[in-house]
Amino acid sequence: MIVRTEDQKLVDVDDVDCSFFLVTVDLWSADGKQEMNLVLHPSSTDKYAPPNPPTKPSASTTRRRTISSSSRPPGHQASNSSTPAPPRPDEQPPSSNGSGYYPSQSQDNLTPSSPYPPHSNSEQPQTWGYPPPPPIDRAAPFPPPVLPSIQSFNRTASGDWNPSNNDDNYPIDPALRNPEGYTNNAQPDQPTYGSGTTYPPNYQTPPMPPNSGNATPQNNIPRNLATYTRTLVGPLSANACRLLDEHRKPGIFFLFQDLSVRTEGTFRLRMRLMNVGAPPAPEPGSCRVHNDISPILAQTFTEPFIVYSAKRFPGVPDTTALSIAFGNQGQKLPLRNRHGTGSKRRRRNQSGSEGESEDDS
């Protein structure tokens, strides 16, 4: 660093308080017109990976989903046995031949002694000994599902029916309560059979969308974002040091011991000088660092230099006399030993002396 007065006269180094001077560096292009501190690199992190990868469904799950999603009219129920109560609609196991659903009969035709209707497939043998079912008109509309009576929830201890119109206690879907084409002439009670078991109404289970649990919303898929990497690596700032140059003249120097560039090409370093001391800095007498913004006192660019890859690197250049002078003053610099270290020369001398002594003997 060279300090001049307003009259362009050099200021003596001993008259400058260099305790709070600081220089920062950044990387620029060879012409000094474009900043090169960041470089764009492709990265594997740009590829989107779903947080929960879809798992392959098992064979039983696929078979059950295929059977349950097959075309069946609403209101049908499976008949796997003759007397036990049927399970819930969402837990009904599929039959072995996949045709275990039958249309619901009207209440007039159902009597306690009437058996369950067998399978609708007429080609299969009569396993249970029941007569063949009557022909079914599949073009006819199916009756709407019959809901349980609301009065059954407010029955008193004496057995009387106590109607209630309070919809808040027992919320029911309005679409199920009054479906289209459904009248209020339906009988409130369900048919009972000889065993005394009351069967719940038939509800149509909504079809499950395929891979609904593994579907990933489109809004959560991030776009391919650019990944930037810092090109100039190392200590990007240095404090001022009062040292002697190779001619034994004092001066103020800023040393950057280990700077490296990750990209090939020709670059320059931009250096900016600032003072981080509290007033009266930069005049002598400052005792602490300020917490405000530091103005740029000076700025300059280095000479262009070439960065090589590991394969094209021509080799480490010779150490300059100025670097040797700084190293002799205790500065830690990556210096290259041109003639080898003293220990290697010592080993070489010792091996040579031992060889001469053996020849003399």
From Swiss-Prot:
Residues 1-336 form the Velvet domain. Residues 130-147 have a biased composition (Pro residues). It comes from Coprinopsis cinerea (strain Okayama-7 / 130 / ATCC MYA-4618 / FGSC 9003). Residues 335-349 have a biased composition (Basic residues). The lineage of its organism: Eukaryota, Fungi, Dikarya, Basidiomycota, Agaricomycotina. The keyword Signal does not apply. This is Velvet complex subunit B. Residues 42-222, 327-361 are annotated as: Disordered. GO terms for cellular component: cytoplasm; nucleus. InterPro entries: Velvet (IPR021740), Velvet_dom (IPR037525), Velvet_dom_sf (IPR038491). The keyword Cytoplasm applies. Component of the velvet transcription factor complex that controls sexual/asexual developmental ratio in response to light, promoting sexual development in the darkness while stimulating asexual sporulation under illumination. The velvet complex acts as a global regulator for secondary metabolite gene expression. Component of the velB-VosA heterodimeric complex that plays a dual role in activating genes associated with spore maturation and repressing certain development-associated genes. GO terms for biological process: sporulation resulting in formation of a cellular spore. Component of the heterotrimeric velvet complex composed of laeA, veA and velB; VeA acting as a bridging protein between laeA and velB. Forms a heterodimeric complex with vosA; the formation of the velB-vosA complex is light-dependent. Keywords: Cytoplasm, Nucleus, Sporulation, Transcription, Transcription regulation. Belongs to the velvet family. VelB subfamily.
